[in-house]
Regions:
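N-terminal Rossmann-like FAD-binding beta1-loop-alpha1 element of flavoenzymes
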Residues: 8-33
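Short hydrophobic core segments
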Residues: 10-12, 195-207, 356
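Active-site substrate-recognition segment that forms the wall
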Residues: 23-27, 52, 82-87, 184, ...
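Glycine-rich FAD pyrophosphate-binding loop
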Residues: 26-46
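Dinucleotide-binding Rossmann-like beta1-alpha1 core, especially the glycine-rich loop
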Residues: 49-129, 298-300
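Short beta-strand to alpha-helix junction loop
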Residues: 64, 94-103, 142-160, 286-291, ...
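Helical element adjacent to the flavin cofactor pocket in flavoenzyme catalytic cores
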Residues: 141-198
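C-terminal catalytic lobe of FAD-dependent flavoproteins
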Residues: 151, 284-389
Length: 389
């Protein structure tokens, strides 16, 4: 499809977040053009597990966004759930030690205070949830709201639905610069031509910082590498998304070095997905078998039957990490006409639809469903000023 000369909004990025922005903007009646340097869902959305989680989030802005996104996945978008294999499987967080269970109990109380459905599980009852779980665990917590989608299908079908409302999608179309009028962004220059638009949304994931830099603004999104292992197809031996309680700490950590914690979940196809790892190594793509071995050993400690299961493959990708662990969502006052929707790290699939709806609201002058100030693009400027004071 030829590049349009004009659009109401250009969305940069055809992953899950960009697709959600396009869907809700088109639904609001805007003429939308989506551009991506590669294929649909070619970045983080193709290298993740498709998590829609509340369990791994501390009470605060990110959890509020997760709750809002849940209302959309389960409400307005529920009729399309079969398209992206929405599965409300629930999540089980397990503690190996009593001290860890005490911390999990306190976290669950804070989450419950803001409306999260969570059930504490004592050690004797863990196998009611997961019969094949290892013996000797100290306890856990079950989160019925945790869910999963097939992330590439979610991105592809959200874009297909957006197309049905008039949006256009242009892959292999790299943004090289912005059209400017003074400080304002008024369009994009791409490898395939120029699109004039009064609004541009930076939904470029791990490349969000590079896109922001083209506009002369700083959005410190960094790539954080992670691996996933995939087993041979099996009967249903893992019922829920199951992970060790230390995973929550790793998600919230700013440590740049390698961190691993066991995450195990089944899929509709019978394979089991095994994670997780986190490390900041730039865009270094090589596979480290030692990381995979560490992940496998920790997964076996949760589910001993995995010791005899064949791992068919592994894949890795880069999560768009922000230093304060909050995404960047909303208009950028430093470059009027530029919006951001990036920096969701490992939560982008789950948070995508809430992000898209919030972006569409601000694009159309409608009051957003929640306060966007914690996600403001310019917040990092004040943090730097405080650091240098």
């Amino acid at each position: 499809m030829n590049l349009p000369r004009f659009a109401d909004v250009v969305v940069i990025g055809a992953g899950a977040v960009g697709a959600a922005c396009a869907y809700f903007a088109a639904q609001a009646g805007l003429r939308v053009a989506v551009v991506d340097r590669g294929p649909i869902a070619g970045g983080t959305s193709s290298a993740c597990e498709g998590n829609i989680l509340v369990s791994d989030k501390e009470a605060g802005p990110e959890l509020s966004l997760a709750q809002y996104s849940q209302t959309l996945w389960r409400g307005e978008l529920a009729e399309f759930g079969h398209l992206w294999e929405f599965e409300s499987k629930g999540g089980l967080v397990v503690s190996a030690k009593p001290g860890t269970q005490e911390n999990l109990t306190r976290l669950a109380a804070r989450q419950r205070n803001v409306g999260i459905d969570v059930e504490l599980v004592d050690a004797a009852n863990l196998k009611d949830y997961e019969p094949h779980l290892a013996n000797g665990m100290a306890g856990g917590a079950f989160y019925p709201q945790d869910a999963q989608v097939q992330p590439m299908l979610a991105a592809a079908h959200l874009l297909r639905l957006a197309r049905g409302m008039g949006a256009t999608v242009h892959t292999n179309t790299k943004v090289t610069s912005f059209v400017r009028q003074g400080d304002a962004v008024t369009g994009v220059v791409t490898s395939q031509g120029t699109i004039a638009a009064p609004a541009v949304v930076n939904a470029a994931g791990t490349w969000g910082a590079a896109i922001a830099e083209l506009a002369g603004v700083d959005v410190p999104v960094l790539p954080r590498k992670g691996y996933v292992m995939v087993t041979e197809p099996l009967p249903e031996l893992v019922r829920h998304k199951v992970y060790a309680a230390e995973y929550v700490d790793n998600v919230a950590s700013s440590y740049a070095g390698l961190q691993t914690s066991p995450v195990v979940e089944g899929t509709r196809g019978g394979t089991i997905l095994i994670g997780s790892s986190r490390e900041r190594v730039g865009f270094e793509k090589s596979v480290n078998p030692l990381v995979l071995a560490e992940m496998a050993n920790k997964a076996i400690a949760l589910f001993p039957f995995l010791a005899d299961v064949l791992a068919l493959r592994s894949y890795s990708g880069f999560r768009p990490y922000c230093p304060d662990h909050l995404p960047v969502i909303g208009p950028d006052p430093r470059a009027p006409g530029l919006w951001h929707a990036c920096g969701h790290e490992g939560a982008g699939i789950g948070l995508s639809v809430g992000t898209g709806a919030l972006i569409a609201a601000t694009l159309t002058g409608t009051a957003p469903a929640m306060d966007l100030s914690p996600f403001a693009p310019e917040r990092f400027d004040s943090l730097r000023q405080e650091a240098h004071a």
